[in-house]
Amino acid sequence: GYGSQRLASFYADYLAGAGPMAGGEPLKNAPAENCAHIAFYLRTGADDRGFYRNILTGYVKEEFERLQALHPGLYTHQIELIPGKGHSIDYRPTTPWLKQYTRNPYPKYVYWEDFEMDGLHRKGFYNLFVKERPNDDINARTRYEMSITDNHITLNVDNVVYETVQKDPRWGIEMKFRKNYTPAAKGKVIIYLCDELVDLKKEITVTVNGKQAFQGKVKPHLKT
């Protein structure tokens, strides 16, 4: 459960869906915002108290419900706390539910919280490629939020700092967080485009952090 929940957030752009079982990770380890375009199914026993799996699963459910309300049609999920069950649960419902969904390779809305996993950062996410991160600290996080409306692209890039608001008294596990955002002051991002995202025959405008960064026509090519 832990591994697939983390990978669902880290590699969401590769996936159609993910089905962690008997998991429940702190959301800092697997930001739910990254899962806008995947189907997410998490099942945990309501009595699975080890490392607060049941409580953390509840927090994950709350977050997915919040995101789905903000972005109707995105953040498809089913998150269950199974009454009377501990760490041993019925895994069989997960696969039939997931098989209903297909991957969206061309989303016009992208939310990516770039975070470190095992000493590595992703170099890109969907059609975004990072040439230069805004912060050289490997532990620093960055939020990239892109929206495409007709031929106008809006990209907001922010530094993300977590503030722990709940920690368990026994193990010191960070349970709940508040995120603070500040606009990034530097960095370089390539936005890859195709016919599925914009009309390449028409002029395109790009706005980054409230300022127009590009206006004009682009010529399709296969260079990287």
Question: What is each stretch, according to the model?
Answer:
Residues E65-T224:
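Alpha/beta-hydrolase-fold serine-hydrolase catalytic core, especially in secreted/extracellular enzymes
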